[in-house]
Amino acid sequence: MKETLSSKVPTTRTVGVTFDSVSESKSKLKSGSVQGTTATATATGPPSPPSSYVIKCLLKTARFMWQVTTIPAKIGDTLGTLYRYAQDSVDTFLCVAGKARRKERDGDQNSTDTKLYLEESVLERKLPEADLKALVDLPAGLDYNEWLASHTLALFEHVNLVYGTISEFCTQSGCADMTGPGNRTYLWFDEKGKKTRVAAPQYIDYVMTFTQKTVSDESIFPTKYANEFPGSFESIARKILRLQFHVIAHLYAAHFREIALLGLHTHLNLTFAHLTALHRRFNLIDEKETDVLRDLEVALRLTDDTSGQDSSSSVHEHSSSSSSPPVQHQQHQHQQQHNNSSSTSNSTSPAEALHVNSQSNSNSHSNSSNSHTTTASASASLIDGDSAAPPICTQPEAGAGCKPAGSSGLLGGILGDLTSGEFGDTTRYCTSAVPQAAASSSASAAGPGADGAASAALNNGAGALHLNFSNNNNNNHNLNHLNHHHHHHHHQHHHQHHPHGHHGHQGHQGHQGHHQAPASTTVPHSGLIQCNAAGAVGASAGGGGNAVSAATGGATSASSTA
């Protein structure tokens, strides 16, 4: 037994050694095969899938092209490889084309979703086109930089106010990019000129911060007597207006539904029309920037139309001499609208509302030298003022006052109702509350002193145009310089550094006591453009004929005066 055990021990040991060697060889073979497989997979396997779907398709095609170049062992393999290559080539073409078509469909769907502002129901109320041209025309004798600064400040305030109402809907997650209509994306350029992709709230905050800092700079927007505008002021104003246009484009593309539900779409349309008219008049923004909202310009009839020059002149009763250069137009209708308005009535409000084409003296209203002269280039675009086309703003019934937004849907002569606390008191804007027949009868009963009011009523409710530039930012520039100042530094401005970036502006009363008239007082309103034919009719019926603003106490009483 011992010998047997001793004789079997070497055998067992040998077997064990043999087993170990076999296991070692197997493990080596396995490891070698694994390594070979790994190397093969690394060499012949496809690369990591790219992020782009199109690149994946192209790489897939390149792989089969490599397979065709290899010499197969049999002719059948060659035919099979060629067939697979042809099939994959077709699939590659279809996948790229399908991806492009899918993007196009998605873009069309997004474009349709973001163009709610083109619906007829939200385009029916706005100021007449002719008044917008009169709003931006440079008055005779007024400095161009002063005029441009006033409009820049007004547009900055209006855009900031409208955005402030929906700022809670514009979030980092909901608006990850600063987008505009047509899948337009805006990138922010920092101080070093580096492009940065930021979210829409941050982009708009940058815009408002930059604008507020710029308009508060005394060296750029001078308010003191000894200071002058810098030579580069126009380029700075162009940049501010371009950035404000980006904000407007984002509001239309991403938040127009909320704005329409709040009843503020008319104010946004009016702000856009104001900016477009100013840009068209002085060519301030590149056409590539404004192309994204060109369809809205067409819907609002703000596009260039050479045939609209004659009709615009007929609406305004412009007298343009054929021998005089085409760059100057005498605006007689607005002169008639303010024939009986004195110089004190033009500056009674502490907010210094702009009476477009107002007279510097009530005793010289018949003198044509006091009418404002438009200075424009011969190639300047004219806003379509087709008198044959009916106004979009519908006229309410006689004796019916302005109703708040929502009481009559989108109908009526109201341009909007601002009820937010950020806008101060409730302020309503009406194009007209008196039909043409009633306005004509009241004007004829008032006598010849009401010619301006009658012409305003017959102009489809165009009325006397009022613009308040100095409610929320006392950094404004007096736009009645033609009547009261021959230099833009005769008055003091106080730059109230209010919170930028759509924080609610509180109305600061500026120019206190500068042009006070004990005869009439006007409470500052929200600062948006007012078309107030009813005020002119009511004043003419009373015998005064003053086309002053009827917005007293923060609300426009349009029909109570009729």
Swiss-Prot record:
Question: What does the UniProt keyword field contain?
Answer: Cytoplasm, Metal-binding, Nucleus, Zinc
Q: Where in the cell is it found?
A: Cytoplasm; Nucleus
Q: Got a GO cellular component term for this one?
A: cytoplasm
Q: Name one Pfam family in it.
A: Mob1_phocein
**Residues annotated as region Disordered?**
30-50, 304-378, 468-523, 538-562
- Molecular function terms in GO for this entry? metal ion binding
The family database entries (SMART domains) matched by this protein are listed as: Mob1_phocein
Indicate, by first and last residue, each region the UniProt record lists as having compositional bias (Basic residues). Answer: 482-514
Q: Which InterPro entries does this one have?
A: MOB_kinase_act_fam, MOB_kinase_act_sf
User: So which domain of life are we looking at?
Assistant: Eukaryota
Q: Which Gene3D superfamilies match?
A: MOB kinase activator (1.20.140.30)
Detail which positions bind Zn(2+).
Answer: 170, 175, 250, 255
Q: Where is the composition biased (Low complexity)?
A: 31-45, 305-349, 357-378, 471-481, 547-562
- Do the record's keywords include Nucleus? yes
Among the GO biological process terms of this entry, one is: cell morphogenesis
Tagged with keyword Zinc: yes
Q: What is its main location?
A: cytoplasm
The family classification in the record reads: Belongs to the MOB1/phocein family.
What this chain does, per the entry, is described as: Required for the normal morphogenesis of a variety of polarized outgrowths including epidermal hairs, bristles, arista laterals, and dendrites.
Assembly and partners? Answer: Interacts with and activates trc, also interacts with wts.
Q: Give the protein name, as stated in the record.
A: MOB kinase activator-like 2
Species for this entry: Drosophila pseudoobscura pseudoobscura
